[in-house]
Amino acid sequence: MSTLGHQYDNSLVSNAFGFLRLPMNFMPYESDADWVITGVPFDMATSGRAGGRHGPAAIRQVSTNLAWEHNRFPWNFDMRERLNVVDCGDLVYAFGDAREMSEKLQAHAEKLLAAGKRMLSFGGDHFVTLPLLRAHAKHFGKMALVHFDAHTDTYANGCEFDHGTMFYTAPNEGLIDPNHSVQIGIRTEFDKDNGFTVLDAGQVNDRSVDDVIAQVKQIVGDMPVYLTFDIDCLDPAFAPGTGTPVIGGLTSDRAIKLVRGLKDLNIVGMDVVEVAPAYDQSEITALAAATLALEMLYIQAAKKGE
């Protein structure tokens, strides 16, 4: 069975065209791409409303609304002229086999990184970040984490496949350094001794974007950074289509400005997760996710053009 593809026995989770209508390449390891987009249609680790397996398809579908703009406002260049980005489709695994998904995703990521590519991944529920972190840590060593979310996902008593436990597991496996990591937009109960710097939603909404970014840069330093964005970081007014929405979150405008502010960090991997289109209204959650993903690519292109 191929590791990647856009057709499968249950092909309704996948698309036949790439994010932003970027080229499709199901053998990205031998390509000349700088960044490779991978969809991970998985939601078996969800504790709330399921449906995140349809997230990659929804993000790709709505991204056609963004593809027409050559110079994404307010950037003064076309990202596609600076970065070679391909979409390698969705990870193919036996639906119902969470372990196979995790192992295949980690192996896929390790192969891409060994070939000199960087990854932007679309979930799927947030558990998919853990196998991605395992692969990135093998290649880059211990990393800093910049984590946008309503939840810290540091629950210690979950099961093996649980979208609320990744950032308890990752420090224990030596994948990330919590002392150089920051969690942004949190507004649910969490353990205060988990080692992460937590910038709760109230702080982030009340402080200036520049002030928040300055603190993030100070915490992260020059470490390699993995950037993960759970769409429920946004207030449900801007992102209702997710499994565990929490009132009182960030606006889409503030989130975009914060992501842009991360341009100077040494970001080595990125993902956008937890889009569940069955609960969306007018595709606004998928559009927010696609826009944030595009901004992530733009900050990489901006750095390359310096």
Curated annotation (Swiss-Prot):
Q: In which pathway does it act?
A: Amine and polyamine biosynthesis; putrescine biosynthesis via agmatine pathway; putrescine from agmatine: step 1/1
Stored Pfam families: Arginase (PF00491)
Per the record, the domain of life is Bacteria
Cofactors, names only: Mn(2+)
Q: Which GO terms describe its biological process?
A: putrescine biosynthetic process from arginine, via agmatine; spermidine biosynthetic process
Positions binding Mn(2+) in this chain are: H126, D149, H151, D153, D230, D232
Q: Which NCBIfam families match?
A: agmatinase (TIGR01230), PRK02190.1 (NF002564)
Q: What is this protein called?
A: Agmatinase
